Amino acid sequence: MKLLVCISKAPDTTSKIAFTDGDTKFDENGVQYIVNPYDEWYALVRALELTEANGGTVTTITVGTTTDDPTIRKALAIGATDAVRVDAEAKDPYFVAKQIAEYAKANSFDIVLTGKETINYNGAQIGSMVAEMLDQPFVSLAQKLEVSGNTATLERDVPGGAEVVEVNTPFVLSAAKGMAEQRIPNMRGIMAARTKALNVIPAIETAELTSIVSYSMPPAKSESKYIDADKMTELVEILHNEAKVI
């Protein structure tokens, strides 16, 4: 089994977020990065579980620069067989998807796995674009994945229940919560990942179809009010006069 897992970095949720150049650029000063959780906890770990049970390899692919190397090595420490970095800034989703699709096309993977979205942009576009470019089936928001031979069975939530999908390889999926459990790398994996060579390849020429106009912070949340359980009259007055919901 030959699996390709798409890996990207995302700011740690404890990092302070700021913008520069008239709010047109993300200020990376002091920002700590992590592997995007949907890529790491679900797509990568499930891929590793499958190859541990059935044999095979797990390759990660990242579109990025040397600033992405620490998160790539985290994926290697967790257990990925090898890692590819397309040497380019991750621009718009089409650009990123094109780089991944071209590499996947040239290397014939059984399954391409992505996280359902990144926690910084929440775009959820890469998986479907890659599938379209490869002319392969795409299963989104998968929460379970089992493989037998060249047939895979996937499950995902739908309103009121669950949907079970059966698809033949090769195909592309986006992994959601429930696909696997977070795996903490051990010291042996961390040490091995430090010296493992990364396969850095040039980007192919691809048009950018979108661009960032500006960034903005979400509006500040209003302060919460706490009402004692024995002051129902005060609560009713607030709901009526301030919130205007009754």
Residue locations for each model-derived region?
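N-terminal glycine-rich FAD/FM-binding segment characteristic of electron-transfer flavoproteins
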Residues: M1-I246
